[in-house]
Amino acid sequence: CGVGFVANLSNEPSFNVVRDALTALGCMEHRGGCGADNDSGDGAGLMSGIPWDLFDDWASKEGLVPFERTHTGVGMVFLPQNENSMEEAKAAVEKVFTDEGLEVLGWRPVPFNLSVAGRNAKETMPNILQIFVRIAKEDDADDIERELYICRKLIERATKSASWADELYFCSLSSRTIIYKGMLRSEVLGQFYLDLQNELYKSPFAIYHRRFSTNTSPRWPLAQPMRLLGHNGEINTIQGNLNWMRSREATIQSPVWRGRENELRPFGDPKASDSANLDNAAELLLRSGRSPAEAMMMLVPEAYKNHPTLSVKYPEVIDFYEYYKGQMEAWDGPALLLFSDGRTVGACLDRNGLRPARYWKTSDGFVYVASEVGVIPMDESKVVMKGRLGPGMMITVDLETGQVLENTEVKKNVASAKPYGTWLQESTRSIKPVNF
């Protein structure tokens, strides 16, 4: 796969960010796969901040008031092809939102150009709509995201017995981020979704992904980015990870869910791809109160034992990994992961280090990460920092502060937030080896 992101350190939404991401994505075509028609891509997609100017413009044309941005969730939804099934699915979605006390503001048909899609993509293409909902009962931004997460889980549960259940899929449902994706080649994603050509589509960041399908056959929902992650690689431990997630479902609790943990289960889906299940696990940790960097460190730890730098300079990072090693098995395999919750954008490489990732920062306040260099035209004189991710390394961009943190800075901040070393000393019990 080919992945990358563009981020504006001033956190100013702009169309240029989206345009640069699409340019870079187009240069990643050789990293993806195509179907037998040589035109239907394994998948291509883009995650960004929500383009409120674009949606407010649509709302005004529809006679709607401008959206209350802090309390409005936007869902990018794949719906059944059959017209009657689509209406049933829409009604089921609306019922869950209404029952949860959310106000459904309307549905927006997503404009597209079908002529650039391949034959296989056209035959399997879902109806693509966006739903807008208002969340009045919550004021905290994280609680709003949790409410939308619960709603999506309830929708999945309410529709699982429907004949069209496999055709209903939320690419995203958030008040911060949105995802445009499909069974497309990278160079035509921006031509297919007409929104991506509109200069009102503005975002301070964009994650892009071109898929090469390995473990699962191409389908519209399996294009990436997923709801939190863009993944280049495979998770070779997926069966064990799913089994352990399932075994812990009954005991996982957090006060942030206010006793609603049962509504979140199941946490994994054996029918989904390895990337989708890793995304599910990351999203669960994020919505439970973890930061994106903390979630990535728990899921994809580096090879920390006998690490010369960590042992001497950052023992608190080793304490973090030791604390969580018995609570979360590593999702292992070649993996370059790009991630965002709309406030932080980042990338990390798993401990195998078998996927390329380059990054660079420019004097005009932009940070770029990509599977390879040369995907965006660049004035070299503007580059003030550059490097590559090695095994187990990470880089993050805080969009709200403009701070860029490289590897050990990220991990030190996460590991220093809690007294993991003290907890280990107080709670660890050694068991004598037993002869078998």
Curated annotation (Swiss-Prot):
Pathway: Amino-acid biosynthesis; L-glutamate biosynthesis via GLT pathway; L-glutamate from 2-oxoglutarate and L-glutamine (ferredoxin route): step 1/1; Energy metabolism; nitrogen metabolism. GO terms for cellular component: chloroplast stroma. It is an enzyme of class 1 (oxidoreductase). The active site is at 1 (for gatase activity). Its cofactor is [3Fe-4S] cluster; FAD; FMN. Belongs to the glutamate synthase family. This is Ferredoxin-dependent glutamate synthase. It comes from Hordeum vulgare (Barley).
